[in-house]
Amino acid sequence: MAPLVPSSQPWVEKYRPRQVKDVAHQEEVVRVLTTTLQTADLPHMLFYGPPGTGKTTTALAIAYQLYGPELYKSRVLELNASDDRGINVVRTKIKDFAAVAVGSARKGGYPCPPYKIIILDEADSMTEDAQNALRRTMETYSKVTRFFFICNYISRIIEPLASRCAKFRFKPLSEEVMSNRILHICNEEGLSLDAQALATLSTISNGDLRRAITYLQSAARLFGSSISSTDLISVSGAIPEDVVKSLLASCKSGEFDVANKEVNNIIADGYPVSQLISQFLDVIVNADDIPDEQKARICKKLGEADKCLVDGADEYLQLLDVASETIRALFDMPQTLVF
């Protein structure tokens, strides 16, 4: 099947819910926010939970329902805190926008309340100094500006900020919810996706609906309307399951040379070792033939190797270390001594 003609619009945006009530699998959040929207009197808000569960979508839907398309750009400031997270941004861009007062005239049937909204995406990556500076800005301009903080880890938001917000937890999306949404997009775009491919997409996206939709669009552009599990794995960067199982099998052989050869093959094929470690962890944890004590030793080494990779260590040496420790754990050999 020939690839589909590329669309200029990402499907993540094309199929993003425009109203709060359309956000999937967040019934409690939707119920509370729908009631709050009827009065248009919103507090500062803090949305937290795993990626791809609808946090940003909900914030944008609230803003759109309050102001409509005409006033949206002048009343809403969106900032990705991963890029704009320093104290200077708080002192200039955010403060300047927050300080401007606005009217409350209804326009086009939208409530248009007398305040603006600042949406800070990935707020948990803001520096502590920037968050402290933001606290003062929130207090000073609370009558004319509302802040929406969006983060994955609420523990990284300082308590003085978190205590000033209404907190909403976004639950991880179930496989059924993700599958229903993906099948809806497939029907709209004329795609054919069998049950195995659908299960694969759910697995490689790890409950992140945004990531799943992106993988689906990438596969459609490259492989056409009929998409297989192999197609999805190739566009996602996930490592084929047989590669991960081959590494474990080489470790189970008890032969270091066999494991070393498998490690060399993995490095030569260019697979990212950090991704391999993540998938290897899943295989180890779910293995029925490995005792818990041995699993614990292997998982400890996987965590250490992952940390070393983040710090810039050599991929080959780290993967070889993982393989050798896995052999020692599987055959109850003594652990290596660290001096």
Curated annotation (Swiss-Prot):
Gene3D superfamilies: 1.10.8.60, 1.20.272.10, P-loop containing nucleotide triphosphate hydrolases (3.40.50.300). Its main location: nucleus. GO terms for cellular component: DNA replication factor C complex; nucleus. One of its GO terms (molecular function) is ATP binding. It comes from Oryza sativa subsp. japonica (Rice). The keyword Nucleotide-binding applies. The keyword Nucleus applies. One of its GO terms (biological process) is DNA-templated DNA replication. Keywords: ATP-binding, DNA replication, Nucleotide-binding, Nucleus. ATP binds at Y48, G49, P50, P51, G52, T53, G54, K55. Belongs to the activator 1 small subunits family. Heterotetramer of subunits RFC2, RFC3, RFC4 and RFC5 that can form a complex with RFC1. May be involved in DNA replication and thus regulate cell proliferation. The lineage of its organism: Eukaryota, Viridiplantae, Streptophyta, Embryophyta, Tracheophyta. This is Replication factor C subunit 2. It is found in: Nucleus. Disulfide bonds: none annotated. Induction: Down-regulated by sucrose starvation. It holds the Pfam family RCF1-5-like_lid. Expressed in roots, leaves, shoot apical meristem (SAM), flag leaves and panicles.
